[in-house]
Amino acid sequence: MEIKQTNFAIIGLGGRGQGNLGELISIDGVKVVAVCDKYEDRAHRGVEIVKEKTGEEPEMYLDYKELLKRDDIKAVMVATTWITHVRIAVDCMRAGKHVAMEVGGAASIEECWQLVRASEETGKFCMLLENCCYDRNEMALLRMMREGIFGEVVHMQGGYEHDLRDEIGLGRENRHGRIHNFKNRNGELYPTHQLGPIAKALHINRGNRFLTLTSMASKACGLNTWLKNTQGEDYDLADYKFNQGDIVTTMIKCAHGETITLVHDCTLPRPYSRNYKIHGTRAAYNEDAKGIYIDGVTKHEESDWMHSWEPFEKYLEKYEHPLWKTYASESEKHGHGGMDYLVFSAFVESAMYDLEPPIDVYDAATWMAITCLSEQSIAMGSMPVPVPDFTNGMWIDRAPARRSRYNAEEICEEFFSDEEKGE
């Protein structure tokens, strides 16, 4: 496609928003004409980032509603706090702009419906910026699933397992919104990082859907222990009763019988993991083991009754997604190993040409709803709760996602050169 210069804006310039801004303006055709944050120092920093990278000065706003009055902005990226993503995205679409939101869970089911209705009524898209759908391993594994290596997929697992005790515990000092959620909520607060790739693999909202979920939370003591050890016994939150359990486990049942397990684990010491697991009738994958087991292919001694994983690395080159054959050498220059650049490129392409995004409003509503649904389940003693069908029945025979380089459900070979495909 021919590159068309397109005007973008960004709302939210904390740590994530500033990183996003730098990534966004590196994409051909993007012109950031406005930046906004309610904190003046952060908004000023947004202006500086654009000037440093492009030599041009965007307009600065402290009130995003003033920014939305402009008619020269085609699309907006929202990178604010979790509980403000949706309301701002709805206002963007109502103001005639396409919008992409950073990830996070929903505060209520009603706001998910507001998001869907705003997109349907305005014709403007809302894309969730779930970068993990574009991770190198996840895309290779998607290809393996589509080529039948796993057979019929029965169960998938994932999570957000990330030691964020400092980020959460010192959230007031650093103006970080996570702490407010941990003080007041108890649920699967950050579901989409691994649920996104899982949902795409299982054709959720296009031939399959989530039916019910049940969640359970452990006790909460990780943050208190960390705060006492690092800030002292007299720190005012050292004995605060945080509502969020240290470990939250959520199980989801799908319309075609697949099951999903999600784990949220951010307040205990551990290395980072998204705990991705795939189990099918022919093969199994385990992220933490960096391993795969393929029935009849993975070799093991007959005396090895435990059966060993073989390194996934040896399959990566063979099943590499063409996007990564193209961008692998450049990935270290971009955020989160390159997957930020890819999901932002997908957003830019969709906005530039008014195309359906690869992660659409129905995906956003469905994945984000897991947060408030898990809160309900936990509050009711881990009772099962139904997952709304935000497609209003369209999932049954909905058309496949638009084919493109950035399709997150299928590998669209026709959009890649022979060199990109490794031929």
State what each model feature region is.
Residues 1-53:
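N-terminal Rossmann-like dinucleotide-binding module
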Residues 12-14, 122-127, 132-242, 284:
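Predominantly a Rossmann-like dinucleotide-binding segment in NAD(P)-dependent oxidoreductases
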Residues 19, 271-423:
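C-terminal helical cap and adjacent loop that interface with cofactors, partners, or active-site loops
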Residues 57-75:
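A structured beta-alpha segment of the ubiquitous adenosine-cofactor-binding alpha/beta core
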Residues 68, 74-75, 81-134, 148:
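Beta-strand-loop-alpha-helix segment that lines the small-molecule cofactor/substrate pocket
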Residues 250-256, 280:
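Active-site beta-strand termini and strand-to-loop segments that position acidic
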Residues 262-272:
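Glycine-rich phosphate/pyrophosphate-binding beta-alpha loops
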